[in-house]
Amino acid sequence: MKQTLLRRAGLALDMWHLFRRQSQLCRWLQLTVSDAGAAAPANKVEARWLGKIRIGTCAHHALLVPFGSQAAYRFVAPPRSRLVAWCALAGGGSQHGNVEFVATVRNRQQGQERAARLRLSPSQEGADRRWHKLVLELENGEEQQIELTLATRTEMEDRVATPSALWGEPLLEWPRPIGELRGALRVAGPLARRGSFVAAARTLRGHLSEGSYHSLYQIWLREHALSPAKLADMRRRSTSFPYRPLVSVVTPVYNTDPRWLRACIESMKSQAYPNWQLCLADDGSTRAETRALLREYESDPRIKIKMRGTNGGIAAASNEALTLADGEFVAFLDHDDELTPDALFEAVALLNEQRDADVIYSDEDKLDLDGTRTEAYFKPDWSPEHFLTNMYTCHLMVVRRALVERVGGFRDGYDGAQDYDLVLRLLDQTSRIHHVAKVLYQWRRIPGSAAAHEGAKPRAHDAGARALEDYVRRNKLDAEILPGALTYVYRIRYRIKGEPLISIVLPAVPDVGHRDRRNACERMLNMLVEGTTYRRFEVLLPVDRGRAADLTVNIPQNLAVREIPMDAAAMRGRVRQQKRAAADATGDHLLFLDWGLQATDREWLTALLEFSQQAAIGAVGAKLHYPDGSLKHIGIVLGVNGVAAPAFHLHPRSSLGYWGTAVAVRNYSAVSGDCLMTRREIYSEVGGFDDEMGGLADVDYCLRLTRAGYRVVFTPYASFVQDRSWHSIGETDGREGNSLQTRWRDRLARDPYYNSNLSRDTPDYEPALTTSSSVE
């Protein structure tokens, strides 16, 4: 009984911490390194992530910051944040003197600094080596632009013999919005009601912790495991495919650990689809074991090997391997990664359905050194605007060989981003790009590799930016390339063509008897005067014909507002009001806004217009969040609970979303009508909003746009705060949901921008499980 009570008390303490705080890991942010002012040793190495390291009884992802250097991160810190990090010494422990860990936080807006220090002695630590916790509270109760600097210093003269000073998993913590607990409570609630306190607490803890996604993915893997019977069936079906092209798999090799190179080659030999060829080009390896292992496989007629005399880089080696290829299609496999046994089978199965496909890509995951599969990336179908911000297609990629040869293969000077550069050039030749929604490729997480940490190869990020600049020049786009919020994420900022007129369409002024609501309305009108750098717009405001002179808010004198008188019947509902007002608009673009919005910067109107002006784009939406810092909208996911819901609703504003969905331009099936820009000619072409759809009219409108061949885009560069008291997306009555289901049943069943392996129970990008399992 006593042990049970203690266990429950421990779980309760854990849950209390998780309820109070959430966190963001610094290792997912872009890392910059500079000298810290101290003399650096001649053999200094760069700061880098080393993977998970166990010291004592605890293990943390370790960041090595050499003496004389400092590592820095920049991010937005929510109100009441704190920095938490762990420090440890690894290596020899006989020296005397101290090693000092210094964490400094600087408010980039106000210039204020705070620092926390921890001193460890190698001689004392030698007997009781462990991770030490360091906490730095951020005093300001408001959101801050923060720069975090991590540095290590030592008094010892012999730095070579000094133990390594490691930072363990620096993270930012802040109070958790109560709304984020909704999904977790929905998962754990049934267990609690059945009296299983421990199971409910563990499930809730797993759902709220960083490890929850990993745990869910392990369950997903068990449910989708390839049994011997399934593989045998694939081998049988492969022989009956009407179309059985030879697929040449291209792999450049350089000083690869023989363990991983053997695993890579054996993954090819395990393919269920038999008509393949492996083309290996060794790029002048100096490691004898690597070359010896390649020679072991020379006798296999399916494997062609070329030994280069000199090292020319990954592009040169890949091109050498391409010269060995005989297949109609080529696939790309890195020398330390693996294909799943069904990889080529699934690619050829798609080719039998889509004979004109030129490019095929699949989902992927990561493979830890101990063989654990983790970090699944369930990708959307082909998303052009998404791809121009990030090489999301990545692995596995299968391409028609003639097309690769037509664009000249891989180019020198883009190592690390050579595949991104290749696909950007392929886009000049084809749009026949298809997605296999299955995990067919496994990146091995080797310390120092891009798979282990995306900041491991900063030159690759720069090469990707150059490839994107080349794409912009080739296609004569009037745009510039800017850095994105994450490594390997970019922003193409398009310049505005001419000076088109924007018609800003508002709903009627609501009942603003409450002073706070009236002030919110007036602040929004003032934002239109002072809060934008783009000035050519008109404002349309529906008014009750019988009460046109009775507006309850003050309109700024220098804001030209055109009132649209309506009969009382036409005033019923926001959609009906804006639809009637849009009919009187004269602008080239329509911008539908709800009340209560406040832009976070002055470029918001230009950020929307740069996409709305593009011929292929039908609608563009903005990033919306609540005053408490929780997200309201970054795009809408179809099929959630049978209808639709905003992605990552009520997650913290600083959330990156799923693989950066919240901080970069993305394609979605729909965006919120609370802030939606569309060209007036397109609006007329598809029939505008359907007022019978009520609160789901925005989703219905976007689906009619995509049916007409237009794309819908979300941009985080137009960002607003909106009070909770205004129209809330996702909150509709059952009649509207039934109407949407009747009209769009097939589309709601499959959202091309939300992978079929993701759950429709929530819009949070969690793996879809077919069995009910608690998360340990």
Where do the PLM segments sit?
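Gly-Asp-aromatic-enriched flexible segments
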Residues: 5-187
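A short, conserved alpha-helix in the catalytic core of glycosyltransferases
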Residues: 403, 413-439, 468, 604-608, ...
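C-terminal, non-catalytic tails of nucleotide-sugar-dependent glycosyltransferases
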Residues: 4-9, 18, 25, 182, ...
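A recurrent flexible, glycine/aromatic-enriched loop bordering the glycosyltransferase active site
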Residues: 315, 323, 373-402, 583, ...
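Conserved donor NDP-sugar-binding/catalytic core segment of glycosyltransferases
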Residues: 342-374, 597-643
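Short, acidic, metal-binding catalytic loop of nucleotide-sugar glycosyltransferases
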Residues: 266-275, 521-536
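Glycine-rich, basic loop-to-helix element that forms the pyrophosphate-binding segment
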Residues: 308-325, 567-585
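Nucleotide-sugar donor-binding/catalytic module of glycosyltransferases
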Residues: 201-456, 470
